[in-house]
Amino acid sequence: MIKHYQFILSELPIFAALINIQKSKKKKNMSIRKRMNVLFGTLLLTGSLFSQNVCVSTPETSLVLSAPVGGELKHVYYGDKLSEVDLQNINLTGTPDMPAYPVYGLNCPGESALAVKHADGNMTLQMEIVQVKTSKEENAEITAIELRDKVYPFYVNVYYKAYQDADVIEIWTEIRHQEKKPVILNQFASAFLPIRRGNVWLSHLYGSWANEGRLCQEALEPGMKVIKNKDGVRNSHTSHAEVMFSLDGKPQENAGCVIGAALCYSGNYKLRIDTHDDEYHRFFAGINEENSAYSLKKDEIFRTPELALTYSNEGLSGSSRNFHRWARLHKLAHGTVPRKILLNSWEGVYFDVNQAGMDQMMSDIASMGGELFVMDDGWFGDKYPRKNDSSSLGDWVVDKNKLPNGIEGLLKDAQKNGVKFGIWIEPEMANTTSEFYEKHPDWVIKAPERDVVQGRGGTQVVLDLANPQVQEFIFKIVDDLMSNYPEIDYIKWDANMSILNHGSNYLTKDNQSHMYIEFHRGFEKICQQIRAKYPDLTIQACASGGGRVNYGILPYFDEFWVSDNTDALQRIYMQWGTSYFFPAIAMASHISAAPNHQTFRTIPLKYRIDVAMSGRLGMEIQPKNMTEEEKTLCKNAIAEYKTIRPVVQLGDIYRLMSPYDKLGVASMMYVTPEKDKSVFYWWKTEHFVNQHLPRVKMAGLSPDKLYKVHELNRIDNDPLSFEGKTFSGAYLMANGLEIPYNHKVDYHKQNDYSSRVLWLEEVK
């Protein structure tokens, strides 16, 4: 709900007293004119303080702004939803004034959200409120606050979008001007949020290739904390554009007040947290302006990406649940449609794609209950067949030597085996060893007067997506596949290179600093065009693993590849961190081979299955190398996953015991909104003799309901002591269940890994 909050004057003591004075005939020493002047003056004073407050509300939160026309936009409050009484008095709490969107130039010695250079060289801004407008969309309410410079015809609209079916508020700006010549935007953050000083901790993600989504938690200390990306294409390998602030001490999963923030952008970003010796941490989020100064033409509108904010008094997991619900409903393609169980060919055959081998893999995944087969890299190239990563990108024609029956033959095989078919592409990239590059060397990103810097395979280059011809070429890759083979159900969209050359043959020499921004504008145009024509297509975002895990692209993509590292133990850590901001339905989590192809660690199949079942289950393996016993275990697991799939992919997450706490155990669970079903995961993460592991208490259940417990993926000779037994939600949340440290299996099957998946269902 969005309110221009108007006060009921008679409810305030000062007005009640004045009204009583006016009514009293005994106060003959005060003239009516004098009494009315006092009343009118008080009205003006109070109106200027309060009547222009704007309250932006979701079901459980409030964001309050002071927005007097002709005055400065101020931040007043963000947190738990306020009552009517609290709204009346929110300006009287003694809280220091803070700007809601600080600009550079006048009385601004600190960090700013917006800094420009006017056409006449003036570097200052002084913004005042012109008007406040509100509007409604389905399940959302929007307030737009228009700001204008006091001297120059320079405008900023600050937007607040409050979702009424999720506790998330999106903030963004639109910048425009009517000056005679271009204005240079040197800094253009999407949003600013002051956070009251206290024992505030920051949770954020970091990593690298094959080690994405690692969790870091730290107290905010004086100084500047900067989290930024300059990759150009992939923005979530080394850091993430999402953070959480725990407001009352060291972060807790299921207790404490938490603000979550996610910048919805696919390109270079910068998050700044400025802490000085005053009352606030100052948080800025937006596009990374480094090497990206933007020349804004008259009447052109520059829109910044949305910053999504959420607040929860139920700890980190509560903030995650808010993000997940918002994502499934609004920020993820087909976010409420359960995902298929698939087999991807990559770790099974790598580039060694062939017709018979693909048919066999389809047959194998079908026999285990899978629903989709995805042919990965290696299927294309004519003059330069794709035998490794050094050639062929850009030449999106079938290699007839590998696939003599073509894609149509594969589709027939898929139909025969009763599975859907998907295919891999990397459309934003090319190899210099390709027919494409021979025809269009000017379509790649390249610095003038410099040799082209090449990436993967020694020959890979990035296409210039600022160029409309390149945009059309990329769209046509997908359009040709889908037009010629409409039975294709799934596309894996990869991107395996950073921008290593700063230069665009399409942009003018004066606008070379626009390159990063225009690349992602072009990328979004392509995605919009594809989704407009193929709204039902499932698309995975892969970028050397988890390089494109962000809410800038997910409205167009159904899921993402968490990491090229499929090692089950390391995946626990990566998927744990990723779950802070992204729901399980979007996290592709695959059962792979042992020894693992990245870490060479040998992990038992049961453990690999139990980890993969905590996300969107799939397989990344060569089935013909599996034993019949292993295939049977996978077949049973797939059948059981189909039962729990709606709970895992659409349920509420409760993280219970973090692997980062190094207690020897990681544990989490998903619970339906109705609290009638739940899936509980327990993984042993450290292995020592005579360990003493903590007992894990459950969360999110109804204390008054009774739950029957059943173990999934059981390999033990004997059932667990509590198998089939019933417990109250109150008991399970207060005490948990004692999980055995090891599996009771035959001696030759003993190993140092242990994991359990429990299915809880309400007994009615």
Model-predicted regions and their roles:
Residues 334-476, 485, 490:
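Aromatic-lined carbohydrate-binding/catalytic grooves of carbohydrate-active enzymes
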Residues 53-65, 72-274, 290, 706-722, ...:
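Polysaccharide-binding surfaces and accessory modules of carbohydrate-active proteins
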Residues 124-128, 294-313, 753-761:
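Short Pro-Gly-centered flexible turn/kink motifs
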Residues 105-127, 253-267, 311-332, 370-377, ...:
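Glycine-rich, aromatic-flanked loop segments that form ligand/cofactor-binding clefts
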Residues 60, 243-245, 253, 659-703:
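Carbohydrate-binding surface patches
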Residues 404-406, 438-440, 444-606, 616, ...:
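Active-site neighborhood of glycoside hydrolase catalytic domains
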